[in-house]
Amino acid sequence: RQGETYILDRNGYCEELSQSSRRLHMLTGKSPLPLFRAPGGRLSPSLELAAKSCGYRHVGWAAAGFLGDELPSEKFSNAMLLDKALRGIRSGDILMAHLGIWSRRDPWAPAVLEPLIVGLKQKGFCFKTLKDHPQLGIEQAF
């Protein structure tokens, strides 16, 4: 779809979200939570309203939770990304990593994921799924 322009109304948004949900169900055998992330995290008011009308809720991630694993390692070393994450992540932040990106000359996940988890636990953090996230209140909302 790159380079294409298309306009979706409420029904179109709902169908796109439902299509993704059906695909995840097909792949996993489990019904996914009614959550989505807008492409690039860019959520318009009309998309948010449309999604709510068909039972979906937008979930983004915190700026500190953007772990930078897709950035070039020549400019952003693993040590730099780990330090930035450990300094910036706050309670309730949603973290995101592209664990399948191996284009970095120095791959991120093998070097950073375990020290990040250990470092956050040492700071008193615990880890929850989106279903159990206290600020999202998924159980109450759905």
Where are the predicted features?
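C-terminal domain-boundary segment and adjacent tail
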Residues: 104-142
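Charged helix-capping and loop-helix junction motifs
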Residues: 76-81, 109-113
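Metal-dependent polysaccharide deacetylase catalytic core of the NodB/CE4 family, i.e.
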Residues: 1-77, 83-102
